[in-house]
């Protein structure tokens, strides 16, 4: 069960072969994680501290108004970890960027980079990087 995804849409969202390839690549650089049974992907604690200090307390980690470069926000329709309203709030506060764009990837979650619509994500990033600023 993938949080936030309608039950009828869950099958096929994340292709097995793609996840398997990611899992192998994620384990490779960490011999300590690979050596555990079962193997684990270890992550630094900093993200947990940031969650407690900023997200859970409602304090922003940074001020979007301080961003002064072209900015692309990409969000996924079913992202339960960083729901669309969060990106919309950031977008509204990008007051000093010379250009801003927000794109929603349909039928995607926080793991959209591994999901069936990942090519749309890649395409949007490529277009943004290649366009004249």
Model-based region annotation:
Residues 87-91:
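Short, highly selective alpha-helical patches that border small-molecule cofactor pockets
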Residues 124-132:
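C-terminal alpha-helix
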Residues 64-67, 93-97:
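Short, conserved loop/helix-junction motifs that constitute active-site signature segments
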Residues 67, 73-75, 79:
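Short beta-strand/loop motif that positions the catalytic acidic residue
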Residues 1-69:
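Alpha/beta-hydrolase
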Residues 80-86:
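Conserved alpha/beta-hydrolase "acid-adjacent" motif
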Residues 102, 108-122:
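Catalytic histidine-centered segment of alpha/beta-hydrolase-like enzymes
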